[in-house]
Amino acid sequence: MPSKEKSKGTYHETKIKEWLDSLGVVCTKQIASGQHGHLRADLRSDITISLQTETLYVECKYRNVNKKSRFPNIWEVLENNDIAIFKKSEGGKNIKQIVLMNQDVFEKYTAPTLHKHRKELK
């Protein structure tokens, strides 16, 4: 029987995958990534995003903001991943999730979209 923490992690990884699905992002939840990620590079993250030419690796983290819980070091979370999604417990302000990405992913995928949709300054 899985531990309470493992079950909670799986639940929130599933919720984040559902959110990505709702945005039209083609992604797959990695089964047993936490158990075997240190053994196989393809299991190093919680979710993979499939693009035409490559795969992006996404790590999911959940924190209850009402309890004092240690926030993971973002540098460590992104060390072997392309994107990190931090989900917080419900309640509080408007921010429910924070998406962080490494510089290469931002430059390759996000910056061109921002450039395409920019408002010209007069």
Give names to the regions the model predicted.
Residues 1-122:
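Catalytic phosphate/metal-binding cores of nucleic-acid and nucleotide-processing enzymes, i.e., regions
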